[in-house]
């Protein structure tokens, strides 16, 4: 039996960010596996254990200490893993750490886990130190943390080829062992019908209609280029609306209003968040087009979901996005007027042209990003780790 300890997601089941969805899908696809046993750290206000998808979910009590919570949580979870491995005499465990938050403490825990006969794998996420939401000292910490985790890990598991190249080139002095396994996405359609009451009432409350809107779904942070997308949409001549599904940050929203006066354009609609996955999938399917402005990070879950659901995708032209979508999308730059022109072109496209792009997008997901495929890649990685 290969025991795998996963540290760094908020836990399962729960409100899903990228890592949480990944852990949920991995344990779901492997729940009947006879040779893999998962132990998943879960951030909580109490301690305890439960079984979910046949994984042992162990709760780590985290005090409310502001931004340092994430670092405290990972360290406490690693300490718990070490205790459990030792007490239960588990042979050859794998500890898989998601994100690079605990670099200064990494050497200590790697030594400890090696002493217990285990290996430490790290998923480096995507350039956390570049994210504009962090103040300069925090960004500096993330960069140092990434460096130290790369130095001490037995293997860096990168969910994007761009991230893998970056790790190899920037940390060549450490000669890091790396491998590439992407994030995944669903390839099925939503379970909701076009006339489902839940969908129709969501549309009615927000004055939206199927194929009458362009869509974006994502975290409301500057590096996702909301400013460019809203500005360009306001410049465009489209009669469709721009529906923005996000957890609004008032400070950033005020900044955008000050710069763009978007409230004067009735086509710009902030429509709240949607945590019902079937409803969100249906909203994606019914969008005329999807905008993706993410500029920082590896393989983005929201982009994969868009390619799996929406036929017409308009993506910011950066390496990460091209790597994922290839020829299955249209691309825009941050040059003034570029996205506005692309929206005009998109509005003029025939249904046949849109269908061809949609089929390419779904095929791309099925070929390289389905959860079934990703789970099989991880199975191979974990079961062959000690060979």
Language-model-derived ranges and their functions:
Residues 138-156:
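Membrane-proximal helix-turn-helix segments that form the acceptor-binding/catalytic region
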Residues 5-7, 203-224, 230-237, 242-243:
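Conserved donor-binding/catalytic core segment of Leloir-type glycosyltransferases
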Residues 329-337, 345-351:
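Conserved acidic donor-binding segment of nucleotide-sugar-dependent glycosyltransferases
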Residues 71-82, 92-124, 298:
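An aromatic- and histidine-rich active-site surface loop
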Residues 282-298, 311:
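Acidic donor-binding loop of glycosyltransferase active sites
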Residues 150-178, 182-190, 199, 225, ...:
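A short, active-site helix/loop in glycosyltransferases that binds the activated sugar's phosphate group
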Residues 42-46, 185, 217, 241-256, ...:
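Glycosyltransferase donor-sugar binding loop
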Residues 308-315:
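Short hydrophobic beta-strand element within catalytic cores of glycosyltransferases
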């Amino acid at each position: 039996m290969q025991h795998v300890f996963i540290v760094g997601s908020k836990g399962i089941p729960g409100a899903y960010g990228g890592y949480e969805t990944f852990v949920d899908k991995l344990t779901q696809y492997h729940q009947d596996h006879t040779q893999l046993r998962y132990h998943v750290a879960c951030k909580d206000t109490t301690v305890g254990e439960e079984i979910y998808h046949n994984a042992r979910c162990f709760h780590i009590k985290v005090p409310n200490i502001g931004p340092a919570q994430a670092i405290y949580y990972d360290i406490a979870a690693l300490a718990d893993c070490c205790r459990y491995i030792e007490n239960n005499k588990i042979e050859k465990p794998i500890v898989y750490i998601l994100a690079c938050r605990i670099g200064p403490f990494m050497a200590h825990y790697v030594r400890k886990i090696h002493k217990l006969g285990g290996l430490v794998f790290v998923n480096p996420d995507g350039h956390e130190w570049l994210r504009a939401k962090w103040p300069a000292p925090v960004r500096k910490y993330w960069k140092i943390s990434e460096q130290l985790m790369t130095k001490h890990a037995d293997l860096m598991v990168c969910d994007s080829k761009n991230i893998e190249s970056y790790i190899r080139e920037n940390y060549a002095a450490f000669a890091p062992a790396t491998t590439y396994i992407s994030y995944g996405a669903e390839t099925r359609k939503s379970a909701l019908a076009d006339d489902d009451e839940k969908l129709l009432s969501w549309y009615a409350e927000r004055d939206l209609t199927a194929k009458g809107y362009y869509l974006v779904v994502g975290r409301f942070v500057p590096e996702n280029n909301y400013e460019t997308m809203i500005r360009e949409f306001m410049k465009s001549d489209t009669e469709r609306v721009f529906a923005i599904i996000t957890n609004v940050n008032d400070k950033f929203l005020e900044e955008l209003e000050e710069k763009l006066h978007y409230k004067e354009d009735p086509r710009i609609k902030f429509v709240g968040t949607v945590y019902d996955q079937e409803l969100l999938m249906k909203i994606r399917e019914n969008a005329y087009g999807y905008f993706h402005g993410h500029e920082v990070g590896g393989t983005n879950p929201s982009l994969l979901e868009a390619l799996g659901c929406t036929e017409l995708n308009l993506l910011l032209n950066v390496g990460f996005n091209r790597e994922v979508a290839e020829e299955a999308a249209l691309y825009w730059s941050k040059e003034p007027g570029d996205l506005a022109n692309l929206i005009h072109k998109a509005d003029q496209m025939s249904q046949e042209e849109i269908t061809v792009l949609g089929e390419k997008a779904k095929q791309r997901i099925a070929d390289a990003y389905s959860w079934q495929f990703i789970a099989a890649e991880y199975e191979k990685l974990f079961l062959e780790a000690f060979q």
